[in-house]
From Swiss-Prot:
Main location: mitochondrion
Protein name: Large ribosomal subunit protein mL52
Source taxonomy: Eukaryota, Metazoa, Chordata, Craniata, Vertebrata
Family indicated by similarity: Belongs to the mitochondrion-specific ribosomal protein mL52 family.
Disulfide bridge map: none
Species annotation: Bos taurus (Bovine)
Location of the transit peptide in the chain: 1-23
């Protein structure tokens, strides 16, 4: 009992974040929503208030941070996409060069001499 009194007097609360805390995340994902309700959506993306004359409120720090993160992610996606395209083009160019090299080797291969050269009959 003394331990309980000590715990209550310190005011420390320990919250359990187990499966019960994430209970609705699968349903939200199936509905096309964020797993965490504060992840994205109108409650986090739209301003909390606006002026009486209809002007929008200035963006808040969290909105600016999320916008910067999305822009950074989009830039990275574009950069990686460009790198993939450049790599694919380089690979295709190397494949074409290999084919041309094989053709050149076949054309420059040693030709038969002697009787076979004078009598161009069907090859064996």
């Amino acid at each position: 009992m003394a331990a309980l009194g000590m715990l209550l007097s310190t005011g420390v609360r320990r919250l359990h974040c187990g499966s019960a805390a994430r209970a609705g995340s699968q349903w939200r994902l199936r509905q096309g929503l964020a797993a965490n309700p504060s992840g994205y959506g109108p409650l986090t993306e739209l301003p909390d208030w606006s002026y009486a004359d209809g002007r929008p409120a200035p963006p808040m720090k969290g909105q600016l941070r999320r916008k910067a993160q999305r822009e950074k992610f989009a830039r990275r996606v574009v950069l990686l996409s460009q790198e993939m395209d450049a790599g694919l083009q380089a690979w295709q160019l190397r494949q074409q060069e290999k084919l041309q090299e094989e053709k050149r080797k076949q054309q420059n291969a040693l030709k038969p001499k002697g009787v076979l050269l004078q009598n161009p009959g069907p090859s064996q």
